[in-house]
Amino acid sequence: MNPNQKIITIGSICMVIGIVSLMLQIGNIISIWVSHSIQTGNQHQAEPISNTNFLTEKAVASVTLAGNSSLCPISGWAVHSKDNSIRIGSKGDVFVIREPFISCSHLECRTFFLTQGALLNDKHSNGTVKDRSPHRTLMSCPVGEAPSPYNSRFESVAWSASACHDGTSWLTIGISGPDNGAVAVLKYNGIITDTIKSWRNNILRTQESECACVNGSCFTVMTDGPSNGQASYKIFKMEKGKVVKSVELDAPNYHYEECSCYPDAGEITCVCRDNWHGSNRPWVSFNQNLEYQIGYICSGVFGDNPRPNDGTGSCGPVSPNGAYGVKGFSFKYGNGVWIGRTKSTNSRSGFEMIWDPNGWTGTDSSFSVKQDIVAITDWSGYSGSFVQHPELTGLDCIRPCFWVELIRGRPKERTIWTSGSSISFCGVNSDTVGWSWPDGAELPFTIDK
């Protein structure tokens, strides 16, 4: 091979190597560009987020909360939650609230509450002793947490409310508007599905605790009319947020307000407040067709406040100290009854649970169990029932639970505001203890001085 041929051969080989190297570099650049494009696309893919925990939402299988089981047998009450919202609110951003209540789905329990459109220790908390204003809204947060703008979910505009879960979605009922023409707005999964207009034009109001769901239908009780005389009371049956049936109670000489309702063996029992003339609590029980029975808890262990000292009860309204009242609850077990009540007979202070083994039908004042919840030297307030379904607990029965509102501020304390925290307990058939779980906040706040 002469020198010219060698030069041509070496040059050709170098050119081939250069071309191959160039092609490999181009391929590498294309590969990097494609990989980068895929990663960038994934980073910018829109994902829905929750407004409470900022985690990507995952599809959750729905169930039907049957409500066909009986209440679990219990021997006492185990502490379930305490939010300490007034103590935390002296320094943190916590809503001014009242009328808190708890309701559970098959996945979680949430605290619902009526805000005043204001925060504790802020100028807008002034005058929040008022029950009904256009600023009041129903909101919710995880149970046991202090309700704040950072963990709470808006539910409805309301100065009276109820909420419950049927196994698929949350139903909320929010009443707002003028006293002589308020409207209840029903929402299902956050979407308005129906409305109920005041039919007596006299402060339409509802439970201030959870509604009750059985086999996909949910039930609530509403009142319209005088708070100190005969009013009108209706039971509503709702499916997916729409009213499918309602019945007005034929209940002369009865007074029902702020009912605490729960399912038991496929039927609903509600224990309510008589603000007219009863120191004992009226009840209404009904089936899924709204066929109902009415009565008063007969026990001589009286459950309302104010009330007389325990004595001889009645299966009708007990008149002494019967005017006014406070929201409360009881759980029926055959002829027996667990009664929740304030310790004081004339002020909203203290709280206790009493087991009267024949108090649903018997009029004596004997009882066999008393469990302390709040000392008589500490403020309490409203109380109400809620339940945990077997789909949540894994039990073969419906667990009874209750919450107690711990009101602070006006009218009993020297502040410019009225608000409250809450505690809750659930029934168990094991060891429990009586104690005092008070609100515990030191008042007044800076804004009050």
From Swiss-Prot:
InterPro entries: Glyco_hydro_34, Sialidase_Influenza_A/B, Sialidase_sf. Substrate binds at residues 98, 132, 257-258, 273, 348. Residues 36-70 are annotated as: Hypervariable stalk region. It catalyses: Hydrolysis of alpha-(2->3)-, alpha-(2->6)-, alpha-(2->8)- glycosidic linkages of terminal sialic acid residues in oligosaccharides, glycoproteins, glycolipids, colominic acid and synthetic substrates. Its cofactor is Ca(2+). It is a single-pass type II membrane protein. GO terms for biological process: carbohydrate metabolic process; viral budding from plasma membrane. Homotetramer. This is Neuraminidase.
